[in-house]
């Protein structure tokens, strides 16, 4: 990772090299932290953060679920994000707000510990590589099952949840694949380790419902709105592993990955007739995040003061 200039910590901007925490930080030991991920893109009117308010709303909702009093409002966090981009001077960057139980009492009860809040930014290219945007990725159905919502609140973007994702990711990479696809405890498709998943069959677009134990992704919501506006037939429904194999098109979506085609699942080729619907959605998404479609300009928050 290439260091930038500043990181925001508990209301103050500190130098990148000084953004440190104690080794006995409670959240480091018990996974008691929440985070968000959002992107800033260059646009004709200057850099802008895509769907900033929706990301911060989810961040605050995650805090409520985990009984974290952040001590900062959505407005204060929004301004901190924008000022951080201005100070670091990068028009194309990734933003990572995080809140965690700070140094203090150890043990499983987090309620005695102060909640620390920080925001970092860095330059981050396509999460699954440039080929993911053009040629597509090779995926495998993981042996690791997606966390059950009865065990962990999956709508909260909690760091602890991502240990489950990391196991699936490592398994896929070790087997020579680019990414994993995770099933839930009922054996139906949930999502990728850090992405939602969409399927096209007979020109009908579908994605797993929230009841399958997925994170309600903001890029997922963006694509659903695009599909409605483009008159693409769309459903939220469960899919089996076998239905993945017989898909006409598959793609991942997420803030980090954008929209990435899946060209193969467990050795089965996907997209024999190309990816016409995926390509249309990707083209629109790219135009929207770069401020070239007025209809969706409300989703862009300008960085310029």
Q: What residues fall within each predicted segment?
A:
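Short secondary-structure junctions
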Residues: 86-93, 232
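Short, internal active-site loops enriched in acidic
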Residues: 100-105
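Helix-start/capping segments and mature chain N-termini
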Residues: 1-72, 76-83, 106-305
């Amino acid at each position: 990772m290439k260091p930038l200039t500043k990181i925001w910590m508990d209301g103050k901007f500190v130098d990148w090299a000084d953004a440190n925490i104690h080794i006995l930080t409670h959240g480091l030991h018990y996974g008691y932290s929440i985070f968000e991920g959002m992107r800033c893109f260059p646009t004709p009117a200057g850099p802008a953060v895509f769907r900033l308010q929706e990301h911060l709303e989810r961040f605050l909702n995650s805090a409520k679920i985990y009984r974290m009093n952040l001590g900062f409002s959505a407005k204060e966090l929004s301004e901190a994000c924008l000022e951080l981009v201005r100070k670091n001077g990068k028009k194309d960057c990734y933003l990572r707000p995080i809140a965690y139980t700070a140094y203090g009492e150890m043990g499983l009860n987090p309620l005695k510990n102060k909640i620390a809040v920080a925001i970092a930014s860095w330059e981050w290219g396509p999460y699954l590589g440039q080929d993911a945007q053009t040629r597509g990725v090779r995926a495998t159905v993981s042996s690791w099952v997606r966390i059950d919502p009865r065990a962990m609140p999956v709508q909260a973007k909690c760091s602890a949840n991502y240990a489950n994702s990391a196991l699936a990711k490592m398994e896929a990479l070790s087997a020579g694949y680019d990414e994993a696809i995770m099933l839930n405890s009922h054996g139906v498709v949930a999502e990728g380790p850090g992405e939602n998943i969409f399927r096209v069959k007979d020109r009908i677009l579908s994605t797993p419902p929230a009841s399958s134990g997925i994170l309600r992704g903001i890029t997922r919501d963006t694509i659903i709105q695009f599909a409605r506006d483009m008159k693409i037939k769309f459903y939220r429904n469960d899919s089996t592993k076998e239905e993945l194999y017989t898909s006409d098109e598959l793609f991942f979506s997420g803030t980090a990955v954008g929209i990435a085609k899946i060209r193969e699942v467990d050795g089965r080729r996907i997209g024999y007739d190309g990816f016409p619907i995926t390509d249309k959605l990707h083209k629109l998404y790219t135009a929207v995040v770069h401020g070239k479609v007025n209809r969706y300009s409300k989703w862009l928050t300008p960085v310029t003061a």
